[in-house]
């Protein structure tokens, strides 16, 4: 993953990776200097409270009617989400020594990526399909995900989980396999998502207990490994075809994605080539067809060097009418990180309302564990917003997130905005031990993403007093979304 490492100290901007256009202008130099001299004070919180628009009441009846119609549809999804989070975060129940999601009807059919480098799309969508089983059965389109126009890579060039997250969280998908069949080399325009993914958690590296609880809660965990095998090939010194068992002990970077769907603490060490030091393995669902392994499944030793380092789980999946509009400028998602060499920073994205709406929720990435956040919303933002961003008003949501990942946070009260009105979503982030706590998209020079800086207006600040435009200064967009309903 490409990373922007920006440190603003005194009057200069220092970067580990230099990006064009990152020179600070005279105003931002002065601001940075004042922050340094003035200490870490925060005068912005004394600003006026957000005002309620007169038109808010007029839209209440329509909103209540819509919410009533959605209530029954959402009821199952909300209960499922609450139960998942309870299992994942709160359960102290002892874990079984063995679990196989196949036996619970919680694994989607094994698919075949064939000769294309699309394992990342298959593993992502398999994990997503598993997350809704057995109550809902879906077959999502890997073709549509891997043909995302914001990514430059072809299907033969591979991908990674951040690309899957960007596709799903920007509401480009998922669409169904029927709408966009796999392997024809084309993807229809104008397809609408059949689900909205609102939360994706990234679990700690090699945390077996958390991974297992996530499998129990959500049906599967997307992860990565290194393999010398190609699609359908079983020739590898690290794979035992008789036992469908694999273990790679070296430090080579991962090149293949799978879905963890179970485990067996007593899976024998002797089943691996070469023999593992200890018993125990994860059960994984592959995308090489049913001829591979045990009907498309295989065991990977707990001692594998890579499996369990990167762990993605889809914890909140909602109906496509959960919100009317999504405001965003980060179609390529979390490409890098931005900050001031400290664990805290402020960020803001400014949007122009298309209709008379109410802002209901805000979405953002927590770049590491135990991220604390405070969310504000500023109305009637002027064309030059740097001074206005100091007057944030009241906190509309705050909390602490135990896992890294993407979160949609409902506001404690909906904020009305008028058609054509500029409004700012403002967030304060504090991520322990991080020095760049703000997730951004930018051109990392790796040929993966097609970045559009014209669709965003983002700002960052160290203390919330002096703000700089990230499109102008760092050539990036802030990953900070807003969800609205039409009044």
Language-model region placement:
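C-terminal motif of bacterial Sec signal peptides marking the signal peptidase cleavage site
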Residues: 9-10
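Short strand-edge motifs at loop-to-beta-strand transitions and within beta-strands
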Residues: 405-407
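Catalytic-core signature of thiol
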Residues: 18-360, 365-399, 403, 431, ...
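Sec-dependent N-terminal signal peptides
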Residues: 1-4
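Extracellular/periplasmic, surface-exposed regions of secreted and cell-surface proteins
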Residues: 13-14
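Buried hydrophobic-core signal for structured, non-transmembrane domains
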Residues: 360-364, 409, 425
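Short, surface-exposed beta-strand/loop patches at domain edges
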Residues: 428-487
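Noncatalytic modules at the cell exterior or secretory-pathway interfaces
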Residues: 415-427
């Amino acid at each position: 993953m490409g990373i922007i490492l920006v440190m603003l100290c005194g009057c200069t901007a220092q970067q580990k990776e230099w990006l064009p256009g990152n020179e600070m202008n005279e105003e931002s130099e002065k601001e940075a200097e004042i922050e340094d001299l003035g200490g870490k004070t925060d005068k912005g919180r004394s600003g006026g409270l957000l005002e309620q628009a007169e038109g808010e009441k007029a839209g209440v009846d329509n909103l209540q009617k819509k919410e009533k119609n959605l209530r029954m549809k959402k009821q199952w999804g909300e209960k499922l989400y609450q139960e998942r989070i309870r299992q994942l975060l709160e359960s102290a129940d002892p874990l079984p020594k063995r679990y196989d999601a196949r036996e619970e009807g919680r694994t989607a059919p094994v698919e075949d990526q064939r000769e294309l480098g699309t394992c990342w799309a298959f593993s992502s969508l398999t994990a997503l399909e598993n997350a809704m089983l057995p109550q809902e059965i879906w077959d999502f389109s890997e073709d549509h995900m891997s043909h995302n126009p914001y990514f430059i890579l072809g299907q033969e060039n591979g991908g990674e989980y951040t690309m899957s997250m960007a596709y799903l969280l920007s509401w480009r998908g998922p669409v169904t396999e029927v709408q966009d069949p796999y392997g024809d080399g084309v993807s229809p325009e104008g397809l609408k998502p059949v689900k909205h993914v609102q939360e994706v958690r990234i679990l700690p590296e090699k945390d077996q207990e958390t991974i297992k609880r996530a499998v129990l809660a959500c049906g599967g965990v997307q992860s990565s490994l290194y393999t010398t095998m190609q699609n359908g090939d079983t020739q590898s010194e690290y794979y035992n075809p008789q036992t469908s068992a694999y273990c790679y002990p070296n430090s080579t970077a991962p090149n293949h994605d799978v879905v963890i769907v179970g485990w067996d603490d007593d899976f024998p060490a002797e089943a691996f080539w070469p023999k593992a030091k200890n018993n125990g393995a994860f059960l994984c669902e592959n995308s090489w067809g049913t001829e591979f392994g045990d009907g498309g499944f295989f065991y990977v030793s707990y001692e594998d060097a890579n499996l369990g380092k990167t762990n993605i789980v889809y914890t909140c999946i909602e109906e496509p009418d959960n919100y009317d509009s999504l405001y965003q400028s980060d179609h390529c998602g979390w490409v890098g990180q931005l900050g001031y060499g400290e664990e805290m920073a402020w960020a803001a994205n400014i949007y122009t309302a298309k209709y008379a709406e109410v802002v209901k929720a805000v979405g953002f990435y927590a770049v590491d564990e135990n991220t604390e956040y405070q969310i504000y919303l500023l109305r009637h933002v002027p064309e030059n917003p740097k001074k206005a961003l100091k007057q944030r008003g009241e906190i509309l949501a705050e909390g602490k997130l135990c896992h890294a990942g993407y979160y949609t946070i409902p506001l404690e009260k909906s904020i009305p905005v008028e058609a054509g009105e500029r409004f700012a979503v403002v967030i304060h982030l504090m991520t322990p031990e991080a020095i760049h706590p703000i997730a951004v998209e930018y051109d990392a020079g790796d040929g993966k993403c097609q970045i559009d800086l014209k669709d965003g207006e983002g700002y960052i600040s160290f203390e919330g007093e002096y703000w700089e435009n990230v499109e102008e200064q760092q050539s990036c967009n802030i990953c900070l979304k807003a969800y609205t309903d039409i009044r």
